[in-house]
Swiss-Prot record:
Belongs to the universal ribosomal protein uL24 family. It comes from the Bacteria. It comes from Solibacter usitatus (strain Ellin6076). The gene is rplX. PANTHER family: MITOCHONDRIAL RIBOSOMAL PROTEIN L24. This is Large ribosomal subunit protein uL24. One of two assembly initiator proteins, it binds directly to the 5'-end of the 23S rRNA, where it nucleates assembly of the 50S subunit.
């Protein structure tokens, strides 16, 4: 019997961007806020500053100038477990999208807070 090949997973649509401030909704770090350091759309995970800290044991390698010991670093968390924090109302909110007309007949999609309506995108 032949084994069926698994299809590659489709990239997840994540509304978060690097440098966004987010609040963790579930898990051992529930309630913590932090900046997004990286977004991985293939796995649907985000790396949040000072959230899901893990200890990494490394061996010393003098040839590569690596000092051994126990290093703490962030571990990725599922993007569905965080919400963006609105700079206007200072709450974890869902995101809406508005389409703004710009010069030349083009349109720009901006992220907007659903509660207060403030734009979440940086200029």
């Amino acid at each position: 019997m032949a084994i069926a090949k698994r299809k590659p997973a489709e990239p997840v649509r994540i509304e978060l961007k690097k440098e966004d401030t987010v609040k963790v909704l579930t898990g051992r770090d529930k309630g913590k806020e932090g900046r997004v350091l990286a977004v991985n759309r293939e796995t649907g995970k985000v790396l949040v500053e000072h959230v899901m800290m893990i200890k990494r044991h490394t061996r010393p390698n003098p040839g590569k100038q690596i000092k051994g010991g126990i290093a703490e670093r962030e571990s990725p968390i599922n993007a569905s477990n965080v919400l963006i924090v609105c700079p206007g109302c200072h709450k974890a909110v869902r995101i809406a999208h508005h389409i703004d007309k710009i010069a030349g007949g083009k349109a720009r999609r901006t992220r907007v807070c659903r509660k207060c309506g403030q734009t979440l995108d940086r200029k």
